[in-house]
Structures are given as C-alpha cells and as structure tokens.
From Swiss-Prot:
PANTHER family: APOLIPOPROTEIN N-ACYLTRANSFERASE (PTHR38686:SF1). It comes from Treponema denticola (strain ATCC 35405 / DSM 14222 / CIP 103919 / JCM 8153 / KCTC 15104). This is Apolipoprotein N-acyltransferase 1. Pathway: Protein modification; lipoprotein biosynthesis (N-acyl transfer). InterPro entries: Apolipo_AcylTrfase, C-N_Hydrolase, C-N_Hydrolase_sf, LNT_N. The lineage of its organism: Bacteria, Pseudomonadati, Spirochaetota, Spirochaetia, Spirochaetales. The chain crosses the membrane at residues 30-50, 57-79, 91-111, 115-135, 157-177, 197-217, 514-534. One of its GO terms (cellular component) is plasma membrane.
Length: 544
C-alpha cells in the first residue's frame, strides 16, 4: 500500500511539474517574456510519467495534465468571459487524455525509439488543435522561442511546427534516456544508444541557427512607410453613448497629435472595434438626429478633412441581402454584424461611407461565434444571455490598398493562426496590420502571449507586422522577426513606426505551402496508428 502511494505521488509530482514548466515557458506572471529555455525540458516530466503509467491510466493522467497546464497558462482567460475557463479546461481534459493515450500506445509499441514517433504525435496534435470551430493556437511549444529571431526564421519554411518539433524531440529523447539510465544504471551503454539521435538534434539546432543567420533580409535599402498606431487604453467593459463619444474624442486627439508631430505620416490606424457605433449602418438606416448617427457623421467629417487614410476597427452592420433596402420594418432583425477593418481615404470613400473592407473570418468560439444553434438551441440561448456578442464570419482575405501598399488586416484572434496571414501574403500583401483589443483581460500576460504568436507571422511570410491594440502590445515587428518598437501596456499613446516595406514582396516556402509540416506530422501519425492496429490484428490471427 505504501509503495502504491509513493508511486502515485511521484506520478502526480511529474504531472504538476510538467504543467508548471509548460506554463513558465510561455509569457507568464513571473516573467512577461517567459522562460524560453524551460521549453526544452518542459515536457520531460510528461514523457517520464507516460513511461511509468499503464495504458488504462494514461487517459486520466492526460486529462489532469492538460487541465492543469492550461489553467495555469491561460489563467487570465477568466476575465474574458465567465464560461471561457470552463471551456478551456474541458477541451484540454479531452485533448490531452487522447494525446497521452496515443503517446502511451506509441511508447508501448515502438519501445526504445518511441520518442521519435511521440514527437511527431505531439506536433500533429498541436496542429489539429488549431483547426475548426474549436481551433486555439495558444500553448503551441514553438511560440516559446519568439524572442530568438535567429532561430525562428526557419519558420519561413516549416511554420511554427518546425520549432515545436525541435523542442518536443529534445524533451522526448531526454526522458527516454533518463528512464533507461534509471532502469539499467549503465551510463555508457545508454549513452551509446542515444548518441546518434542527440547528435542529429544538435546538428539540426545549429542548422536552424545558420539558416536564420544567412537568410536575414537586408532592410537598409527598403522603402519606408511612416504609420501611426493609436493605443487608446480604453475600458471595453463600459458601453454607452457617453463612453463612445469620449473614446472617439480620445482617438481623435491622439491622431491629431501624431499628425501634428509627424506631418509625413501615410496612414493612421485605430485598433479593433475602436469606434462604436456602427458607421455604415447608422449613416444609412438611422435618423440624422439619432445620437449614434450624429456621432458617426462627426467621425466622417473628421476623416474627410484629413490628408491621410485612416484604418479603423468597427462593428460593421449591413442589411442582409435577403431583404430589400426599401423595407424599413424591423431593421435590426435584418442586420448582419461583422467585426471589420475599414480603410477610409479622404475625398474618395468617406462620405457617403464606402470604405475598403476586411471582415474577420476566424471568430472566437462560443463568445463571437456558435454555428450549432439548431443542434443546441438551449445552449445557444444560454450563451446569448451570458454577455456574448455574435458576429457573422467574413468570407474573403481582402487586401486594403493605399498609395503603393497592399495590407492584410487579421483582426485580434486571427493573427494567432498562420493560415490567415499566409492568405494575405499569397494575394500580394506587403504589410500585415493586426487590429486587436485584448484590454478585456486587463492582463499583460495575455497581451504578451498574443504578441509571441504575432512575431511568427512576420518571419513565416517575411512581411512587416504592425499591431494596433487597445491596451497592448502595440508594436512594429520587421521581416526578420525583430520587434523594432513597442509601446508599454496600459497607457494612452501613439507609436509612429517607420515600416520597412519590400514592395515586390518576398515569398517564402511557407507563403506557398503553409502548414505542410503540421499536415505531414498528422499523416505520419495516422499511418503509424494504422500500422500498429493492423500489426495487432495480424498477431492475433497468427495466435488463433
């Protein structure tokens, strides 16, 4: 009984240690930059735990490890929505229980060199975790290295998945080495078996470093675009006409200050849903004397009298095409709402408002979008009653153009996914501008975790990435993955960035092939599992 308790306690300690190291590897409450070197060893406790546990218990340890890891790592999400933390915990209970079960099957079947296939499985699960309605990119191991541009430039080939593979392989191989050494107590013999894979890992690590060094883009002769990013630091939980007017006045004053101090600014950017109310809807469908309409017309008058374009985040309301413009009965029920980026060019598309438009395509699950209303009507109503704002999904990665520049504008959550910025790049974008509002969490940790993923969007496509945020992290990241300028969090200020632009573009392997490495790992994992299952059936039939 005592031995069982000690055995269980040690397993529990391994699960807790793995969860803590996982969370500390990313931006966290102790260090906003994270402890990136922990990422190389963070998963060792999990892989050791899998070596020690039986297949039938791997589900439970996976559920516990996943829930604890993301509870610590994503603790700030409690402030986003009362349901969010429960959804995250439930998701990673299920995901990690399946992941640990698969990893244990691989460990049992391939034995000594299971760490190779376990690495492939882990990266495959990371990739699959980003897909579909529940897609969520936070927690991918590769993102821990965001502050090492020379290493992560290889993402222009493999995406973030190549960096994840490097980190997970080290943990899996080290755990296997430690476990065998513990069993055999013969360091020389064990070392001989693991010398080759570790030499290959070291060679790969330095190959990535060399690739990063030799592919650094010389930006000294690049064209420059001076762009002002406004960070208003407003409270997103406050919402009435007086608040909207005060927010507008703050945005206007900050913009005028920037334009006065830097008259050669070419574009001013306001963050996600920076201006409320809906510009097009209130201009077209509400009375001229309606307070919302008056505020909209005041904004349009201001924009039309500027000398530069303005890129503005707005809740874009449009009439459903199924209904006629001439029928004004129950208009609110006929409106489709989009989270949008609107580009206004003075004297061209401001009055009446016909801005160039991009509408957010990848919405936050449950709080911005729930596509299963007919299947789960009660749950849908429950979500609506709990402070959710549902938007329609945009359909195209439209580029917004001014002067000689073509900009892609992923909105908030969207820059955590590589495929959206890739779509902009493929269409010919030469600047990526992300509009974000992370102020709802009131957490610098949340904002730095988000920033860590944005850095990869720059190196994947070798495009400059600008982030205009409500409260942080407003920043300019160059094509080499260097954060050139960044405002402190939770202040009202303007970042005026001299953005290096390669007007002819700089297409990468990732720009063409996207997440092929994640797909490849998934295919190999499926083939491995099929091979194991078929082999089991063959052995059973031979026994009979």
């Amino acid at each position: 009984m005592k031995n069982k308790f000690i055995f269980f306690t040690l397993n529990l300690l391994l699960a807790v240690l793995g969860a803590v190291l996982f969370a500390l590897s990313h931006p966290n409450y102790l260090n906003l930059n994270g402890f990136p070197f922990f990422a190389y060893i963070a998963l060792i406790p999990f892989f050791l735990l899998l070596k020690r546990t039986k297949l039938k218990f791997s589900f439970l340890w996976g559920a516990f490890s996943g829930a604890l890891s993301y509870f610590i790592f994503n603790f700030w999400i409690i402030f986003f929505h009362p349901l969010a933390i429960y959804i995250i915990i439930a998701k990673y209970c299920i995901l990690y229980s399946v992941l640990f079960f698969v990893l244990k099957i691989i460990d049992s079947y391939f034995s000594r060199y299971s760490f190779i296939f376990q690495t492939i499985a882990w990266v495959a699960f990371e990739y699959l975790n980003t897909l579909g309605f529940l897609g969520y990119s936070y927690g991918i191991m590769g993102y821990t290295q965001w502050n090492f541009p020379i290493l992560i430039r290889v993402s222009s080939i493999f995406g973030v998945w190549g960096i994840s593979f490097l980190l997970v392989f080290f943990s899996a191989c080290s755990a296997s080495f430690l476990f065998e050494f513990y069993k055999e107590k013969d360091i020389k013999n064990v070392y001989q078996r693991y010398k080759l894979p570790m030499m290959i890992w070291v060679g790969t690590f330095f190959a990535f470093i060399l690739y990063g060094a030799f592919t650094k883009i010389d930006l000294s002769e690049a064209q420059r675009a001076r762009i002002a990013l406004v960070q208003p630091n407003r409270d997103p939980w406050l919402g009435n006409l007086e608040v909207y007017r005060n927010n507008y006045e703050e945005l206007k004053n900050l913009s005028e200050k920037a334009l006065k101090n830097f008259p050669d600014i070419e574009l001013v950017v306001w963050p996600e849903t920076a201006f409320i109310p809906m510009i097009r809807w209130h201009y077209k469908y509400t009375s001229t004397y309606n307070p919302n309409s008056l505020l909209v017309r005041e904004l349009l008058h201001f924009l039309d009298n500027q000398k530069v374009p303005f890129l503005i985040g707005n809740d874009d309301g449009v009439l459903d095409e199924k209904f006629s413009d001439n029928n004004f009965d129950n208009l609110e029920d006929k409106r489709l709402d989009y989270n949008a980026a609107l580009l206004f060019i003075p004297k061209k598309n401001v009055s009446p408002p016909e801005p160039q438009t991009y509408r957010k395509m990848h919405l936050v699950p449950f709080t911005e979008h729930f596509p299963y209303q007919k299947l789960f009507p009660r749950f849908y109503e429950f979500l609506k009653e709990n402070d959710t704002h549902f938007w329609e999904k945009g359909k195209e990665a439209n580029l917004l153009e001014f002067n000689n520049f073509k900009i892609g504008t992923p909105i908030c959550f969207e820059d955590t996914f590589g495929y959206i910025s890739k779509a902009f790049s493929k269409k010919g974008a030469n600047i990526i501008i992300n509009l974000t509002n992370d102020a709802w969490a009131n957490s610098a940790v949340s904002q730095y975790q988000h920033l860590s993923m944005a850095v990869f969007r720059a190196v994947e496509n070798r495009l400059p990435v600008l982030r205009a945020t409500s409260s942080g992290q407003t920043a300019f990241i160059d094509q080499n993955g260097n954060i050139q300028e960044m405002l402190p969090p939770f202040i009202k200020d303007i970042l005026v960035a001299d953005v290096t632009v390669l007007t002819e573009g700089h297409k990468t392997v990732y720009s063409y092939l996207g997440d092929f490495f994640g797909v490849l790992c998934t295919i190999v994992l499926i083939l491995n599992l099929c091979f194991i299952i078929i082999n089991k059936f063959i052995k059973r039939s031979e026994v009979k």
